[in-house]
Amino acid sequence: MSLKEKLIVNVHKEEQPHAHNKITVVGVGAVGMACAISILMKDLADELALVDVIEDKLKGEMLDLQHGSLFLRTPKIVSGKDYAVTAHSKLVIITAGARQQEGESRLNLVQRNVNIFKFIIPNVVKYSPDCKLLVVSNPVDILTYVAWKISGFPKHRVIGSGCNLDSARFRHLMAEKLGIHPLSCHGWIVGEHGDSSVPVWSGVNVAGVSLKGLHPDMGTDGDKENWKQVHKQVVDSAYEVIKLKGYTSWAIGLSVADLAETIMKNLRRVHPVSTMVKGMHGINDDVFLSVPCVLGYSGITDVVKMTLKSEEEDKLRKSADTLWGIQKELQF
């Protein structure tokens, strides 16, 4: 009789059930692991699967997380190069992809990542045909489109992390200027994640008080207080962090866990995430851009119709045209 048999009497033979709330993270670089730890610390999954092509790094990251099991409430952490470990995932988060090389054009980076996605997406779909896909790899709006095209999923199940982080950075910087918590500063950044994102100044408020109502010059070039600089800082923030520490990780990891929480718990919170915007704001192509979306267990269920100024809509359409210009050149 083994020690285990002396200690424990089995009263019910359990057939191995599937996890109910399984999450997979594809790519165990700095961003993937920041997503993983943030998800673990929010207790969002009963099983976490990690996938990557670099097997030693992958196993090391899995072991390192497993060694923290006592301090976590996720009973199963698995990893593998083979996508079989991802089977029955409810949410699959894609952070894998090539990093931009110095002097490399965005279009070139896109094509390299399309080739990586051509391998990843069919494997994800094979083992988790009903999952939601959350794309984080950059350029996120184009790669969300790519994931949608390759997966054959309905558009509500393919979500780009989009401007969720841009909006969080915006609220943080605004809050610092005003001396209050970011949760109490409301403001939205929409459109393309990154350089051509669009701050919706008309909607910025604290306690329902419109800041543009109090300070009509807000966000314009003639503004004495230079609030436009806040949006510029949002755009520059990733470049600044990359220059200082080599990459960004913690904020995007927390932002992704925030989205994962809304999806896994069916919270129906509204987030600025990348979705198919054809037919909205005068956009006529199959492009993905961030707009305020209601998120829940089935993915994106609704989109909030924003009231945008004509110049804001122009910026959105310009982004859409740029993205479509790149997308139509892609080889699938």
UniProtKB/Swiss-Prot annotation:
<dbReference type="InterPro" id="IPR022383">
    <property type="entry name" value="Lactate/malate_DH_C"/>
</dbReference>
<dbReference type="Pfam" id="PF00056">
    <property type="entry name" value="Ldh_1_N"/>
</dbReference>
<dbReference type="InterPro" id="IPR001236">
    <property type="entry name" value="Lactate/malate_DH_N"/>
</dbReference>
<keyword id="KW-0963">Cytoplasm</keyword>
<feature type="binding site">
    <location>
        <begin position="29"/>
        <end position="57"/>
    </location>
    <ligand>
        <name>NAD(+)</name>
    </ligand>
</feature>
<feature type="binding site">
    <location>
        <position position="138"/>
    </location>
    <ligand>
        <name>NAD(+)</name>
    </ligand>
</feature>
<feature type="binding site">
    <location>
        <position position="106"/>
    </location>
    <ligand>
        <name>substrate</name>
    </ligand>
</feature>
<feature type="binding site">
    <location>
        <position position="138"/>
    </location>
    <ligand>
        <name>substrate</name>
    </ligand>
</feature>
<dbReference type="Pfam" id="PF02866">
    <property type="entry name" value="Ldh_1_C"/>
</dbReference>
<keyword id="KW-0520">NAD</keyword>
<feature type="binding site">
    <location>
        <position position="169"/>
    </location>
    <ligand>
        <name>substrate</name>
    </ligand>
</feature>
<dbReference type="GO" id="GO:0005737">
    <property type="term" value="C:cytoplasm"/>
</dbReference>
<comment type="subunit">
    <text>Homotetramer.</text>
</comment>
<protein>
    <recommendedName>
        <fullName>L-lactate dehydrogenase A chain</fullName>
        <ecNumber>1.1.1.27</ecNumber>
    </recommendedName>
</protein>
<dbReference type="GO" id="GO:0006089">
    <property type="term" value="P:lactate metabolic process"/>
</dbReference>
<dbReference type="InterPro" id="IPR011304">
    <property type="entry name" value="L-lactate_DH"/>
</dbReference>
<comment type="similarity">
    <text>Belongs to the LDH/MDH superfamily. LDH family.</text>
</comment>
<dbReference type="GO" id="GO:0004459">
    <property type="term" value="F:L-lactate dehydrogenase activity"/>
</dbReference>
<dbReference type="InterPro" id="IPR018177">
    <property type="entry name" value="L-lactate_DH_AS"/>
</dbReference>
<dbReference type="InterPro" id="IPR015955">
    <property type="entry name" value="Lactate_DH/Glyco_Ohase_4_C"/>
</dbReference>
<dbReference type="InterPro" id="IPR001557">
    <property type="entry name" value="L-lactate/malate_DH"/>
</dbReference>
<comment type="pathway">
    <text>Fermentation; pyruvate fermentation to lactate; (S)-lactate from pyruvate: step 1/1.</text>
</comment>
<feature type="binding site">
    <location>
        <position position="99"/>
    </location>
    <ligand>
        <name>NAD(+)</name>
    </ligand>
</feature>
<feature type="binding site">
    <location>
        <position position="248"/>
    </location>
    <ligand>
        <name>substrate</name>
    </ligand>
</feature>
<dbReference type="InterPro" id="IPR036291">
    <property type="entry name" value="NAD(P)-bd_dom_sf"/>
</dbReference>
<comment type="function">
    <text>Interconverts simultaneously and stereospecifically pyruvate and lactate with concomitant interconversion of NADH and NAD(+).</text>
</comment>
<feature type="active site" description="Proton acceptor">
    <location>
        <position position="193"/>
    </location>
</feature>
<keyword id="KW-0560">Oxidoreductase</keyword>
